[in-house]
């Protein structure tokens, strides 16, 4: 649906903090699915943890948040040009839970559902999976603001 080049047209993030490789499904104002391929060459694995690489939970949350940012911006009434002048600020991440570790070689699937969307404010429920197994979940509150 959206490849990495299209995602970069929407999100301001770049390597090493662009944490969504592809958007696979999106229903505007309702839900989004995307993923990140986790490689041993991820910068986080230099220190988390040598000899026992585990993808950091905070980066799982950031990847979910970035997927949510794509949904929020694509669900807004902004033109593509107006969208380039906006950014998503996350106001809170609640009820974050980490269920299973994510390791190099995994494909980390993100699924987010809009609980509430009002012009520039939104509440999203996010879940992350590896091989269909829940790895993390959280509730995100965010807003669209000018850069």
UniProtKB/Swiss-Prot annotation:
One CC-aspect GO term: cytoplasm
Reaction equations catalysed: a (3R)-hydroxyacyl-[ACP] = a (2E)-enoyl-[ACP] + H2O
Listed EC numbers: 4.2.1.59
GO biological process: fatty acid biosynthetic process; lipid A biosynthetic process
Active site: 48
Position of the signal peptide: none
MF term (GO), any: (3R)-hydroxyacyl-[acyl-carrier-protein] dehydratase activity
The UniProt record lists the keyword Cytoplasm: yes
Alphabetical keyword list: Cytoplasm, Lipid A biosynthesis, Lipid biosynthesis, Lipid metabolism, Lyase
Localization in the cell: Cytoplasm
Family that this chain belongs to: Belongs to the thioester dehydratase family. FabZ subfamily.
NCBIfam families (UniProt xref): fabZ, PRK00006.1
Role according to the record: Involved in unsaturated fatty acids biosynthesis. Catalyzes the dehydration of short chain beta-hydroxyacyl-ACPs and long chain saturated and unsaturated beta-hydroxyacyl-ACPs.
Official protein name in the record: 3-hydroxyacyl-[acyl-carrier-protein] dehydratase FabZ
Organism per entry: Aliarcobacter butzleri (strain RM4018)
Encoding gene (name): fabZ
